Amino acid sequence: MRRIFLWINFVLASLIVLLIFLQAYFITAYIAGAGEGALDAHGFTGFALIHGAELLVFLTAFGAWPRAWRWIGFTFFLFVLGTVQIFLTPVEERTNGWLHGLHGLLALVVMVIAAIIAHRGMRDLGLRRASPGGDAGTAPPQPMP
């Protein structure tokens, strides 16, 4: 059962990383004049998809890493930071560019944290390449003269 939770957690954390790139594209398209549709896509991607995935990454961490409280806390930090990042979205009535600039900066931090979580899941699932040298019974290749 743990392996199922690891897979779900790994896929969701990886999806967060990919969706943040997509979200950056949407906001850049909006700034470049693509219209309100790009801004709506940016908002939907961030709130519904990314923030929902952040919550699920936290919840699946309980099954993926049972009783690894520091690691579960790290996934909770991803969710909390994502929530703070959403609240830093500029509102049309009041704007403080210096404060709301943290919205974009924290998106990058969320992406890095999600990548760290995905990497841990990849490692625990055994999806990384084997280290050079092979098994203990095989000798490493000899250099050519």
Question: What does each model-identified segment do?
Answer:
Residues 1-145:
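Polytopic transmembrane helical bundles with strong interfacial aromatic enrichment
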